[in-house]
């Protein structure tokens, strides 16, 4: 049920996130093709918000043709039960009935001249296959790209909002700061978003938090269940858990344009509760370096017989 909410959520925000769980076959299928877009005037937050509203209206009216036209062909949606493509979302929403949706804390961040990301909190009312949508707010993110002069949804992800857990007690067995020499030079990043993300996790596994910080843009944003973090908050957050045994899999990359790409993947952290999360990062080219601008984590849902709740679009 939680999934429906997400679905709804996404529709409004980016109407964009869908890839039926298809394994790793097309893991980098979109990363190697050049992206071109017609010149377009700089899009405003009002423009993108209006696009979100149009998407939600299309869902309420069950106008699936309009809804589909507002999504890019390589649209990807990340939910707590998997990653969905455009075809998967179009099939999913046909069982969705939306009666009301409310948004709060909308904020647009520019990725580059041809891509933006809209973040917000969303709560929806309605049904999915006759069952009421779950109550509660979701932290959502929806990315839009300029394709041939049109702004289309390309990515959506939402995470059920929850109160932050109490901080873990300090461990005497582990150093409180980076165990890597400050003289060591961080590995270089490039246009390969998957490779970049692996470099970041290598820094985390070695507790080199200075290196981790060097991979983030000054205005980096992170969305987790307990809220939205800035760069300082992200650096502080990663120092509170042991990433040394993290296992990464199910990689998928989507190229927004020549200066920005999305990578999404599954993280398993033995000993954590929950021990699996779906992570996504948007990498951008800034002043000759590839840096992480945006990151979101969504805990994987417990397996249930018939789960229908977050926004699976």
Where do the protein language model's features map onto the residues?
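Positively charged n-region of N-terminal signal peptides that target proteins for export
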Residues: 1-4
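Short beta-strand edge/turn micro-motifs at domain boundaries
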Residues: 137-168, 276-303
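Short, low-complexity N-terminal intrinsically disordered segments enriched in polar/charged residues
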Residues: 19-73, 154, 162-218, 304-312
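Surface-exposed, charged secondary-structure patches
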Residues: 91-134, 235-276
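C-terminal motif of bacterial Sec signal peptides marking the signal peptidase cleavage site
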Residues: 15-16
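Short solvent-exposed beta->alpha transition segments
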Residues: 68-104, 213-249
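Hydrophobic pocket/interface hotspot
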Residues: 55, 66-67, 75, 89, ...
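A mature extracytoplasmic/lumenal domain signature
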Residues: 71, 81-82, 107, 112, ...
